[in-house]
Amino acid sequence: MKFYYHDNDSSVDQCAPHDSGEPVTAEQLEKIGVLAFHYPDVEDVNRLAKERKYTNRDEVTITPEAMGGQENYEKKLKVFYEEHLHEDEEIRYILDGEGYFDVRDKDDRWIRAQLNAGDLLILPSGIYHRFTLSEKNYVHTMRLFQAEPKWVALPRPVDNNPYRQEYVKAISA
């Protein structure tokens, strides 16, 4: 697991590392409500799920083949990479492969989280973010949910959304 500021070079493929060379600490992530853990054993994930009342989960594999071919895969990656927020926490545990979550800091700068097998990321509801795979084009992830599994993305801008407003208030305190 590695965190750093995104280089914002849009001339380079979104699946490239985009490492600006400016690292981000766990403390900086916590200030924006992002939690990150490394759990080599799924039993650790089960304990966290019980503590945080995550009652449902599923698994998703993202590859060109799993998405029904290259064209569908590229369309799906574009959807994931569009900046958005959710009204629920987003919890992802990487079982295999790797991917990137980009989250906005308090100054609206992108922080990139490089996640590999065993890494778990919790994004608070209301945070603007996006996801993409690495250049390996493969990730197998477990999604955890506090209620029924759902994935409703609200594209930016939705600053008047009550979950967004609550999030901004929480990180401004």
From Swiss-Prot:
The EC number(s) attached to this protein equal: 1.13.11.54, 1.13.11.53
Any GO MF annotation of the entry: acireductone dioxygenase (Ni2+-requiring) activity
Which reaction equations make up its catalytic activity? 1,2-dihydroxy-5-(methylsulfanyl)pent-1-en-3-one + O2 = 4-methylsulfanyl-2-oxobutanoate + formate + 2 H(+); 1,2-dihydroxy-5-(methylsulfanyl)pent-1-en-3-one + O2 = 3-(methylsulfanyl)propanoate + CO + formate + 2 H(+)
Q: Which cofactor does it need?
A: Fe(2+); Ni(2+)
Q: Where in the cell is it found?
A: Cytoplasm; Nucleus
Binding site residues for Ni(2+):
84, 86, 90, 129
Going by the UniProt record, its keywords in alphabetical order are: Amino-acid biosynthesis, Cytoplasm, Dioxygenase, Iron, Metal-binding, Methionine biosynthesis, Nickel, Nucleus, Oxidoreductase
Q: Where is this region: Disordered?
A: 1-21
What GO biological process term is on the record, naming one? methionine metabolic process
The UniProt family comment states:
Belongs to the acireductone dioxygenase (ARD) family.
Could you tell me what this protein does?
Catalyzes 2 different reactions between oxygen and the acireductone 1,2-dihydroxy-3-keto-5-methylthiopentene (DHK-MTPene) depending upon the metal bound in the active site. Fe-containing acireductone dioxygenase (Fe-ARD) produces formate and 2-keto-4-methylthiobutyrate (KMTB), the alpha-ketoacid precursor of methionine in the methionine recycle pathway. Ni-containing acireductone dioxygenase (Ni-ARD) produces methylthiopropionate, carbon monoxide and formate, and does not lie on the methionine recycle pathway.
Which HAMAP family does the UniProt record give?
Salvage_MtnD_euk
What is this protein called in UniProt?
Acireductone dioxygenase
> Which species does the entry assign this protein to?
Yarrowia lipolytica (strain CLIB 122 / E 150)
The protein's gene is named: ADI1
